[in-house]
Regions:
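Active-site-proximal alpha/beta segments of enzymes that process anionic O-linked groups
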Residues: 1-51, 56-214, 284, 310-339
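Metal-dependent active-site segment of extracytoplasmic phospho-/sulfohydrolases and closely related
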Residues: 50-51, 233-275, 314-321
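Short acidic, glycine/proline-rich loop/turn micro-motifs
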Residues: 62, 104-108, 227, 269-272, ...
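Short acidic/glycine-rich loop or secondary-structure boundary segments that cap or lie
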Residues: 198-200, 267, 296-298
Length: 388
């Protein structure tokens, strides 16, 4: 469609503020018991650190992660060739507006809104301080930048900047735009894909290559039709990633590409669709890493884990930038997922690793959690702090 007017964008921003932000800081939350994270720096060796974050990407619908349909032929080929590390991930939140800033600001424990405002260990901030040029390329709207660290981003491109290109090419617009970037000596690049956001077929229906594999018309039930459309959108995502990796492989020097989803998706379980709910299918995301010209052991911190949370992935990315973030509050077997609100008295859920799998606690209001249970998540005084 036509570019949106400044009035439209102003109203959009005001509506976002009115719905999500206004008055929330006046809701006095109990003080959080958490100690500040410590950051130390060393000279980075990586030349390029790329992050691909796809919308609504649920790992158990990816062929590369065992799904019976071949929804990810390119990624599966990388894995089969021993080039791609693949792990089940744990999302930071159940909506894009929550998960993305919590991930980028390396926040583990809920109730620390000052870390969203001050951004002491935001990935873009760490990257810029370490001499990286910083890029944000998104097929979504610019309002997602609100708490993402936009003041530390050198080049930002969103859907509003190239409306015609994005309407015609969808996520492939980003791979079209990548060659135009003038890379510096070191580059931190965030690529934010729309991917499998509903309505799923809108993400791939204009694509001129034959990738849609499963039928979405005819006498199909909603479950079958929507499920097929979702799988087709994932298949389209795989095609976009293939283009991104082709350009990543043209670069030189030590480089890393991490792929994840902002959150998962409900696909008809108990007749519920979408996300925004603290339920296991919405927490379920992939974490996949491609390394080139990397030193031995660069992936060990991730490869040794069965599950990788967004927070843990962020710590690993920070290390690629030469920044080591130590969290004295961390328990490596306990993770937190934030509900659909970024600020205020949001619902949260604790996820605990066990030998049998992930254990999901009942969602709880942040205010109630801070009044008691939060204290019990802290390491014992004689227990050494986990570096992650």
């Amino acid at each position: 469609g036509p570019p949106r007017s400044s009035l439209h964008n102003s109203l959009n921003s005001f509506a976002f503020y009115a719905v999500n932000l206004a008055g929330r800081e006046q809701q006095a939350l109990p003080q959080s018991p958490f100690q500040p994270y410590q950051v130390s720096f060393a000279a980075p060796t990586a030349k390029h650190v790329w992050i691909v974050m796809a919308d609504s990407l649920r790992s158990d619908r990816l062929g590369v992660m065992g799904y019976q349909r071949d929804t990810t032929p390119f990624l599966s080929r990388l894995r089969d060739d021993g080039e791609l590390l693949v792990r089940q991930g744990i999302a930071a939140g159940v909506s894009t507006a929550v998960s993305l800033p919590v991930f980028l600001n390396l926040i583990r424990e809920p109730g620390q809104n000052h870390l969203l405002r001050e951004q002491p260990h935001n990935l873009f901030r760490l990257g810029r301080e370490q001499g990286f040029n910083t890029f944000w390329l998104s097929s979504q709207e610019s309002k997602l930048l609100t708490f993402a660290g936009k003041r530390f981003i050198d080049v930002s491109i969103t859907r509003e900047d190239f409306p015609l290109l994005f309407s015609q090419r969808q996520d492939h617009a980003l791979s079209d735009l990548l060659p135009r970037k003038q890379w510096g000596e070191r580059n931190l690049v965030m690529i934010n894909l729309r991917t499998a956001h509903s309505p799923y077929d809108h993400n791939y229906e204009n694509h001129d290559e034959p990738i849609a594999r499963w039928p979405t018309d005819g006498p199909l039930s909603r479950d079958v039709r929507e499920g097929n459309a979702y799988d087709n959108a994932v298949r389209y995502f795989d095609d976009v990633v293939a283009d991104i990796v082709a350009q990543f492989d043209q670069l030189e020097g030590e480089r890393y590409l991490l792929i994840t989803g902002d959150h998962g998706q409900l696909l008809g379980e108990n007749e519920v669709w979408g996300h925004n709910r603290l339920l296991p299918p919405v927490v379920d995301v992939p974490v996949m890493v491609l390394a080139r010209d990397a030193p031995q052991g660069a992936l060990d911190d991730l490869a040794g884990q069965r599950w990788v949370s967004h927070y843990e992935a962020g710590l690993w990315l920070a290390q690629r930038l030469g920044a080591r973030v130590v969290n004295p509050n961390a328990d490596p077997a306990v993770h937190f997922v934030k509900g659909k609100l970024l600020l205020g008295d949001n619902s949260i859920m604790q996820v605990k690793e066990s030998g049998e799998g992930l254990q999901f606690s009942e969602p709880m209001l942040l205010s109630k959690w801070l009044q008691g249970p939060a204290q019990r998540t802290l390491p014992a005084p004689d227990q050494p702090a986990d570096p992650g």
